[in-house]
Amino acid sequence: MPTVDSSIACANVLIEAQTCLDIHSSAEYVVNDINCILSQMIAPDTSIDEALTVMRLSNKKSTLYVGTETKLLGVISSFTLVSRVVLMIANRKRVARSELTVADVMSPIYKMPALRKNNVHRACIGDIKKTMESLGKAHIQVVDDTNKIYGVISSIDVSRVLHEPVYINATAHSFKDCFNVMPEHEELI
């Protein structure tokens, strides 16, 4: 019986299938199912260092889901946890890095773009990659017809199965985004 790769345990990608997937493969292969996500969440008040330890000890090298037992609040990647984004947020909040929690640096679910489950069913992985790159978002939620979260797609999982990077460039989508970076000449996060 095939097993699921532990680093993308929630995705529908079997180890044998990973070598066969390409940009024309069904996007359903990279959707992380909400039922699996809910069983692997960490609390929003978890420190950044604790989250890194959880990733290391659980062989979960790419993405952690943040929330309560029944509600997904956000997503955080290992890349974010070790990037300068953490220091920028600490500086912006005027706190020490050690005082930040995953809630401070996660990508909140309410800011994630959403795709309908039936659209993802018709899409290929290449479509998802282009969507992420054009939106400048590393995570996309998948919702059903009632807007209930069905799953999440992570650029790290897309990159892993395609064996090529997904280029995510932060993009200002509102005047508030522009205004927030102007006083300190910071980057978008």
Which residues does each predicted region cover?
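Tandem CBS (Cystathionine beta-synthase) repeat/Bateman regulatory domains
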Residues: M1-I189
